[in-house]
Amino acid sequence: LQLHYQETGKPYIDGNNAISFSHSGNYTALMITQSKSAGIDIEMTDRNIEAGIDYFLNTNEIAFLSQQKKNLHALTCWCIKEAAIKYFNVSGIDFKNCIHIQPFELLNLGMPTVLIQHSQEEMIKICYRREKDFLLAYTVD
């Protein structure tokens, strides 16, 4: 397989396959699918992002965060938004005001709805999975 990059930085391979990849700590996530687009993100669960949530979460999203597991819930939202960006192949988008996650309960597995506003509004479902030391979020069409 030959790996190429679009002008936006999104990777692609020859043929009709979509590809997305991510890395965090010692983990790498790779998705290859025959769908038109794919987005995947992986994050280490020990990453502390609570102090920066105002940068990437809007007030509605901050309001639904679990108070007992606020950092983990915020990190899950970050992971979901990263997967959405990769899926839609947009760069320079405002994470806080252009990507909206519908309220969801923090579980080990979930599939919240995400609204992204760029050239047009689109809604997708993004799956997430939590393991002992990492989070994985992904979507395909």
Mark where each language-model region is:
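Core catalytic alpha/beta fold that binds nucleotide/phospho-ligands
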Residues: L1-D141
